[in-house]
Structures are given as C-alpha cells and as structure tokens.
Regions:
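Alpha-helical transmembrane segments of integral membrane proteins
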Residues: 1-30, 46, 59, 75-226
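Membrane-water interface segments at the C-terminal ends of transmembrane alpha-helices
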Residues: 36-68, 90, 97-103
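Membrane-interface interhelical connector segments
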Residues: 68-75
Length: 226
C-alpha cells in the first residue's frame, strides 16, 4: 500500500506539470524530447526499470539501498518507513520504478487533454480579456483536464497494489505482492482468498472515491444533482 501510494503521488507531481509544459510548448525541442522519453517509459517493463535503477543508484553510485524496506515505525496496525531516513531511502527506488510508467501515462493524457482545452472558446476569451497566462493554464485549462486523469489514477492505483508483484520481488520489498507470491508457493488458501478480497474492496472503494472527486472537480455535476 505504501509503495503504491508513493508511486501514485510521484506520478501526479511529475506527470501533470510535464503534460502542461509539453502542451503549452508543443513543437519545441524539449517538448519533443519529453515525448520521446515518454515512449521509452511506456515501453520498458517495471522490472527492467528497477534493475537499471539498482545498477545506477545503488551499485554504481551507492546513494540508496538496493533492496529491503529499511527501519519502520509501528503506528497501531500500520507500519511505515516514511518516518525514518532509511525507510525513505529504501522507498525511493521501488517507487520510482513503479511510477515511471504512470508518469508517462499521466503526462501524455494531460498533454492531449490540455491541447484540446486550449482550443476552446473560453480560453480564447480569457486571453482576449488579458488574464495572465499562468492563470489560464493552471487554474482554468488544467481543471478541465483532470477528469480523465482522476479516473486513470484511481484505476492504476488499484492495479499497482494488485500487480506490483515483480517490482516487490526485484527490490525484496515485503508488501502485499510478496505475501501473495509466498502464499501461492506454499498453497496458503486463506491468505490468497484474503488478498483477493482486499484487492476487490480497494477497487470498489476507488470507484466510489472517483465519483465523489468528479463532483468536486466539475461544478456542473453538483448542480445536476440538485
């Protein structure tokens, strides 16, 4: 859960600004370069990205641990490594390996939606009125691009939790995926059934949260329910 959460946050914090930049400055060399890098990011599987990250940042540079979770802090039923330095360092590489694919998807989706919104009449009217460009891009245009991003992020978050098996195996991360692999190895049926129930509950909860987020982002949906 912790690994998927950090990967999702990274994908949004990096992917959305990159999508806006490539849409605003389309045709520029750096925009085309980001587009090319995004194709590579979509093409590479997560375990290859993980191995490359380990080789560069853990083995060659020695900046972060190559595997494990580091020190954790127990908060009731939840143990987290976000509150310790070694836990955050151990979280960096696997979360980046998971987030790279999501970053490219978010960037390309925001770029496509942003380019369509920038051709809208309300954007032209805002420019004619002299509204600052940053306000047009990040307050008005970007808000109209977030609906598909919310949907994709929620579905990918559930997929990260359910299918991050290979990444957890590469980094020896003691997560739900590793637990499921061990349960399959030893034919532990109660654990497998519990894992599937938890994943199903997560997907149902995410769908509900997406519907709520739609009403928050788009005021027209709130008005339609009145």
């Amino acid at each position: 859960m912790e690994l998927a959460l950090v990967a999702t946050v990274l994908s949004l914090l990096i992917g959305i600004p990159l999508g806006v930049i490539t849409a605003i400055h389309r045709g520029r060399w750096y925009s085309e370069g980001l587009q090319f890098v995004s194709i590579i990011g979509v093409s590479l599987p997560s375990f290859v990205v993980g191995i490359l990250l380990i080789l560069v940042f853990a083995v060659t540079l020695g900046l972060v641990p190559a595997f494990g979770r580091g020190d954790v802090v127990q908060l009731g039923w939840w143990s987290t490594g976000l509150l310790t330095a070694s836990g955050r360092a151990s979280l960096l590489l696997p979360s980046l390996a998971l987030a790279l694919y999501q970053i490219t998807l978010v960037m390309r989706l925001v770029r496509a939606e942003m380019m369509e919104v920038l051709r809208s009449d309300f954007v032209k009217f805002a420019r004619a009125r002299g509204v600052p460009r940053w306000r047009i891009y990040f307050r008005h245009a970007l808000r109209n691009c977030l609906m598909p991003v919310v949907t994709m992020t929620a579905m990918n978050f559930g997929s990260l939790i359910a299918f991050a098996l290979i990444t957890e195996t590469v980094f020896q991360w003691p997560g739900m995926g590793m637990l499921f692999i061990q349960a399959v190895t030893f034919l532990d049926m109660p654990v497998m059934a519990g894992y599937l129930c938890i994943v199903s509950f997560i997907f149902v909860t995410l769908n509900t949260l997406v519907d709520i987020a739609y009403a928050v982002i788009d005021p027209r949906l709130r008005d339609a329910t009145r």
